[in-house]
From Swiss-Prot:
<dbReference type="Pfam" id="PF00551">
    <property type="entry name" value="Formyl_trans_N"/>
</dbReference>
<dbReference type="InterPro" id="IPR044135">
    <property type="entry name" value="Met-tRNA-FMT_C"/>
</dbReference>
<feature type="binding site">
    <location>
        <begin position="109"/>
        <end position="112"/>
    </location>
    <ligand>
        <name>(6S)-5,6,7,8-tetrahydrofolate</name>
    </ligand>
</feature>
<dbReference type="InterPro" id="IPR041711">
    <property type="entry name" value="Met-tRNA-FMT_N"/>
</dbReference>
<protein>
    <recommendedName>
        <fullName>Methionyl-tRNA formyltransferase</fullName>
        <ecNumber>2.1.2.9</ecNumber>
    </recommendedName>
</protein>
<dbReference type="InterPro" id="IPR011034">
    <property type="entry name" value="Formyl_transferase-like_C_sf"/>
</dbReference>
<dbReference type="InterPro" id="IPR036477">
    <property type="entry name" value="Formyl_transf_N_sf"/>
</dbReference>
<dbReference type="Pfam" id="PF02911">
    <property type="entry name" value="Formyl_trans_C"/>
</dbReference>
<dbReference type="InterPro" id="IPR001555">
    <property type="entry name" value="GART_AS"/>
</dbReference>
<dbReference type="InterPro" id="IPR005794">
    <property type="entry name" value="Fmt"/>
</dbReference>
<feature type="region of interest" description="Disordered">
    <location>
        <begin position="32"/>
        <end position="51"/>
    </location>
</feature>
<comment type="function">
    <text>Attaches a formyl group to the free amino group of methionyl-tRNA(fMet). The formyl group appears to play a dual role in the initiator identity of N-formylmethionyl-tRNA by promoting its recognition by IF2 and preventing the misappropriation of this tRNA by the elongation apparatus.</text>
</comment>
<comment type="similarity">
    <text>Belongs to the Fmt family.</text>
</comment>
<keyword id="KW-0648">Protein biosynthesis</keyword>
<dbReference type="InterPro" id="IPR005793">
    <property type="entry name" value="Formyl_trans_C"/>
</dbReference>
<keyword id="KW-0808">Transferase</keyword>
<dbReference type="GO" id="GO:0005829">
    <property type="term" value="C:cytosol"/>
</dbReference>
Length: 313
C-alpha cells in the first residue's frame, strides 16, 4: 500500500523504521519544519526527518498542513493510508478523506482512556497499573475515532514514564504493521469508543512539575515523581533554589511531632531525607540540587548537612 507517514519527535522514529521494513510502501514522511534550538540557535531537523533521510524516503515539511499546496503534495501520491504518530498539527477533514482506505493514528494509551497530548505521563502519575497502544481511525475530534487495534502494556510499581515509553515504542510499531496488514485485507472491524469511559491527558504545564507536599499524599508524590521522570522532572524548593526529585520511596514515619508541616524534613533515613506529605511521608532517594548532577539521598544528606526540621518550599 502507498503510505504517507506524519510524525515529528523521537516517538515517531520506530514507526517510520517499521513501515520501511514492511511490505508496504512508505512514499512520504511529513514532519514539522526545522526549528532553531540550543544555545547557538542553529536550525535542527526533527528526528522524523533525520530518520527518513537516512532511509532515503522523501520528506515534506509544511509550516501548515492546512494550505492548498500541502493538500496537493499529499494528493499527488494517491495514498492508500495516512499514518500519524505525534505529528504536531491537527489534520483538516480534506486530508483525512484523502486515503483510499483510512487515515489512522497511533496513540499511547488504551482509548478511550487518556485522550490528549501526555498519555504516558498521566497514566504513571495517576498510579495506573496498565496502559497500552491504540491504533485508531482519525476523525474531527481529538483521539475520538474508532478503535482498529490495541495492545496492553503493564506498568510496574516502580516504573517511570521513561520505562513505559520504552515498552510502548517496542509494542507499538509491531501493532501498527499488524493493523496495516489487516486493513489491506479488509479484515478490521472498527470498534466505537465508549464515551462514558473517556478520560483526558492534557499537555504538561509548569505547575504539574511542582511537588506540593501539602496537597499530595505520600503515594501521590511517589507516582508523580515516577510520572515526571525522565522529563520534565518533579521539583521542590530548597534554600530558595529548585531541587529536582527523581526517585522517592513511600514511607510512614512515626517519629514526627504533631507540629511538623507538610514539606518538612522530619527524619534522616539512611536512604535519604524523609519528608512529610499531607498524608504519610516519602524518602527522597534520588535528588538533583540546582546546578549539580543527580545524587543519592544519602549523598545529599552528607553534602548539604541536612537535618530534621528543614522546610522544603
Amino acid at each position: 500500500m502507498r503510505t504517507i507517514f506524519m510524525g515529528t519527535p523521537d516517538f515517531s522514529v520506530p514507526f517510520i523504521e517499521a513501515i520501511a521494513r514492511s511490505t508496504h510502501n512508505l512514499n512520504l514522511v511529513v514532519t514539522q519544519p526545522d526549528r532553531r534550538k540550543g544555545r547557538g540557535k542553529e536550525l535542527q531537523p526533527p528526528p522524523a526527518k533525520r530518520k527518513a533521510e537516512e532511509l532515503g524516503i522523501d520528506v515534506f515539511q509544511p509550516e501548515s498542513i492546512h494550505n492548498n499546496y500541502a493538500y496537493q503534495i499529499l494528493s499527488d501520491i494517491e495514498p492508500h493510508l495516512i499514518v500519524t504518530a505525534a505529528y504536531g498539527q491537527i489534520l483538516p477533514r480534506k486530508i483525512l478523506d484523502l486515503p483510499r482506505i483510512k487515515a489512522i493514528n497511533v496513540h499511547a494509551s488504551l482509548l478511550p482512556e487518556y485522550r490528549g497530548a501526555a498519555p504516558i505521563h498521566r497514566a504513571v502519575m495517576d498510579g495506573k497499573e496498565q496502559t497500552g497502544v491504540t491504533i485508531m481511525e482519525m476523525c474531527d475530534k481529538m483521539d475520538a475515532g474508532d478503535i482498529l487495534n490495541y495492545e496492553s502494556v503493564d506498568i510496574g510499581k516502580t516504573d517511570t514514564t521513561g520505562d513505559v515509553y520504552k515498552q510502548i515504542i517496542t509494542v507499538g510499531p509491531q501493532l501498527l504493521i499488524e493493523t496495516m496488514d489487516l486493513l489491506e485485507k479488509n479484515q478490521v472491524t472498527p470498534l466505537k469508543q465508549d464515551e462514558n469511559q473517556v478520560s483526558y491527558a492534557p499537555k504538561l504545564k509548569k505547575e504539574d512539575e511542582y511537588l506540593d507536599f501539602s496537597k499530595y499524599t505520600n503515594t501521590e508524590v511517589f507516582n508523580r515523581v515516577r510520572g515526571l521522570n525522565p522529563w520534565p522532572g518533579a521539583f521542590t524548593k530548597f534554600e530558595g533554589k529548585r531541587l529536582k526529585i527523581w526517585e522517592t520511596k513511600v514511607h510512614n514515619s512515626s517519629s514526627f511531632n504533631s507540629n511538623s508541616k507538610p514539606g518538612e524534613i522530619i527524619e534522616i533515613n539512611q536512604q535519604g531525607p524523609v519528608v512529610k506529605c499531607c498524608q504519610g511521608s516519602v524518602i527522597l532517594t534520588k535528588i538533583q540540587p540546582s546546578g549539580k548532577k543527580a545524587m543519592t539521598g544519602e549523598q545529599f544528606i552528607r553534602g548539604y548537612d541536612i537535618k530534621s526540621g528543614i522546610q522544603l518550599e
